[in-house]
Amino acid sequence: DGKPVEGDFEFLIAATFIGGIEFEIIQPIHGVNPYSKFLEERGPGIHHIKESILDNDALDAAVAEYSSRGPKVNYQGKYMEDHYFYLDTFDALGAYYEMGNNAKVSAKPEFVGWYPEEP
């Protein structure tokens, strides 16, 4: 809805690559966030697809270009150097369209697990 998220929230995420495509499973744990709102409003399903634009200036320009053509940013965030935007394309695509810079970020070791084993 474009409004700032108030308060703390937590979610779990599992990610893997199959070929050149990354798949994420996101489970909200507590607090209000885009993923918990999605589940409340729509139930389980595909939340977003993502386009990676590695350069931040190019990313900002692409988001501005897409937004000028109709789909507005309904959520954006930053985690360390990772910047991402969700465009409201649900009615047209059946999912939100994420654009982000795919910056490499680190997580605390206790938050990282590998299955079946670390590569």
Residue map of PLM features:
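Histidine- and/or cysteine-centered catalytic micro-motif in compact active-site loops
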Residues: 28-30, 54
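Vicinal oxygen chelate
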Residues: 10-24, 38-57, 60-119
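A cross-kingdom feature marking solvent-exposed beta-strand/loop segments within repeated
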Residues: 1-10, 31-47, 80-83, 107-117
